[in-house]
């Protein structure tokens, strides 16, 4: 998944190198509300910042899109399919790993796994305060969003083919998020990079190639 800027997406995912050097065909789907699919002024606006139910719908649409895409790839007789997602895409990759049983590998890059926790951490007192004054606390939001949580589904990808990477200095997705996914997945391979919310570190790029 990427934000909708093709050049940026190719660079973030190292797509040209993976294709030319390793012979991997790379597909970059665009998240709902992102890039050419945006509904507001900015890419991503509305995915988390709109109605609470809209986030459920956006996640459900994301998984539907991915499964349709996987069906198309399989119809072309692809020998194997792996999924690599970054940030919110990492969340969706982790969720897909618990829904689709035909993936060869999954890599969750700098993934948040609890969107309610993420919102309560970063939304600020004005947004959080307005929700709480309306009688909506973090636990209620977490319960609503649990239907699209990667922590609510058991992974179907083989243990050795699950991997996570995260940044020890990530101030957007704090370490407790990837650590919770690591525990939920049975403690598979995890790489802690010497950086922040950045999928382009040497450690992350090496992990992708090795998987």
Residue spans of the language-model regions?
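Histidine-bearing beta->alpha loop at or near hydrolase active sites
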Residues: 179, 189-201, 205-206
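Alpha/beta-hydrolase active-site loop
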Residues: 42-76
